[in-house]
Amino acid sequence: KLSDHIGYYPLVLISPLDSEIILSGSSVRRKFIDSVISQFDKQYLSDLISYNKVLKQRNLLLKQSVYDDTHLKVYNDELVKYGNNIFVKRKDFINEFVPVLTKYYNYISSSKETINVNYKSDLLNFSFNDLLAKNLHKDKILKYTCSGVHRDDLDFFLNTMKLKKSGSQGQQKSFMISMKLAKYEYIKQKTKLYPSLLLDDIFDKLDNERCSRIIELVNNENFGQIFITHTCHDTMKDILNRINSDYIIFNF
């Protein structure tokens, strides 16, 4: 199975598409959380796969005009079992991850701004069992499950304001790069492996100071093999000349 191979060769990719984590819907942010935890926690990945399978079955049951409540209870029990495990591990992950993220953002931005991340989950205020019971009538009307960890989300803040609305392109990009560098460090700590780091055309829309600080960050023994792509050969060479390491340039 493909899931059996996740985590054996850890890889962290930083690319312009990462802005979707800030700008797109909650599913992209959940995918980010899952992509980190699954690298080192096989039980989490198994619970996540099982949860999504049961969720799909429960939603199919809700779409039927007539169904056996016994089946619904079976699905509820399974959702609660897997969902609670996922919730606890996501909450613990955010508590451990945010300080690492903050460290990288403060370095890249020279501590010019403050950031924070807020984990949003239905399970923060109510038990999953109570939520399913409370929302059963709504679920039957809408014919899908309205509560659970499949609705989890993250809010990103810059100086107490939503990053999506108040952050410049440079600030948003600095935040995303910080998230991926924090992901690298977090996975390395958990797996004791050095992931490969791919920097795919990430220096656009960043001022020289922030570019230099990113280069300084990755130019130490905390990082292993690094691949950097850029559309401009001269800019690429200027960036690499600041790295006190051997490098090879490939032109395509």
Outline where the language-model segments fall:
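Conserved NTPase motor "head" modules and their coupling/switch loops across ABC/AAA+ ATPases, GTPases
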Residues: 67-196, 205, 209-227, 234-243
